[in-house]
């Protein structure tokens, strides 16, 4: 797991609404999302960080080898980069971003386990 992926602080943590990766708000702004930046372009854009992440999430899992972990398969993160992931993320991506993802062939499924989609 790359050190820049691990949250550097326990304050100001946010989770990506697309992949549930957990980082600080500054890490998302500085590095973007390790899994989704090709689609969400959060790097250097604080407004996109606020739109595409949530500060409200439940539980975290540290994934060193997501491809080998049954937990990562259950959480739907087995194809993602090693890192710290939220179990459930409250919130949804804005409709405009969901439409853009769909036009690029990326299926968006909410990571909020309280909402059945």
Swiss-Prot record:
This is Transcription elongation factor SPT4-B. Keywords: Activator, Metal-binding, Nucleus, Repressor, Transcription, Transcription regulation, Ubl conjugation, Zinc, Zinc-finger. SMART domains: Spt4. Belongs to the SPT4 family. GO terms for biological process: regulation of DNA-templated transcription; transcription elongation-coupled chromatin remodeling. A zinc finger (C4-type) spans 16-36. Its main location: nucleus. The gene is Supt4h1b. InterPro entries: RPABC4/Spt4, Spt4, Spt4/RpoE2_Znf, Spt4_sf. It comes from Mus musculus. PANTHER family: SUPPRESSOR OF TY 4 (PTHR12882), TRANSCRIPTION ELONGATION FACTOR SPT4 (PTHR12882:SF1). It comes from the Eukaryota. Residues 1-40 are annotated as: Interaction with SUPT5H.
